Amino acid sequence: DPAALNVFYISQLARKQGIKVLLSGSGGDDLFAGYRRHHALQLQKYWNWMPRGIRASIERETKKLSVSNPFQRKLSKFFNGAGLDGIDRLVNYFRWADDSLLQTLYSKEFINHLGRSHAEDPMVNFITPIVSSHTPLEQMLALEQRFFLADHNLNYTDKMSMATGVEVRVPFLDIDLVNFSARIPNKYKQKGSTGKWVLKKAMENYLPKNV
């Protein structure tokens, strides 16, 4: 993820200017539904009526699209896992590489050690108990906060900033704000194609419109 380099260079520049503490917006997307995959999840209902086999065929065809073309890359990513349903489909939004590709990177010893284990198993085990009591978006946000935010975003942000001697603080992860965001209905987090709607509305009188 090239975002780690962004954090490093921003922190490095701040340090050169004598700034030792920065504020990060990490958590905003994870709490208030701001990622593209949240919008993709919303659009999913419009083609879930298709038979699974047809969706799988569309997935195979879109995998042939050029990754160098931004639109084709997004289209391919959107339909990645189209042949899946339920938890498997939800967890697939967080996949960065297909199992077939990963197998080419692993040694035979490591593959034997893995056995029947899969990288997504912890996510599946985490989300299974709450499937019946939470909406798909709520399930996805739970995965964001438990895995993507904690294991990825906060991880590289801390390592890259501290490598330059700068501390990064995350006001969005104030425990009271996190708990409050969990009580906000989905309709205020997503409105049409607009993510983080309630957050943007709350701040529109304090920030320039282009921000």
Predicted regions and their residues:
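Glycine-rich active-site loop/lid subdomains used to bind and stabilize high-energy intermediates
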Residues: 1-165
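Active-site rim elements
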Residues: 136, 165-168, 186-191
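Short, conserved phosphate/pyrophosphate- and ester-handling motifs at nucleotide-, phospho-/glycolipid
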Residues: 174
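Short, solvent-exposed hinge/capping segments at secondary-structure junctions
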Residues: 178-182
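Short, charged, surface-exposed loops that flank catalytic or proteolytic processing sites
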Residues: 191-197
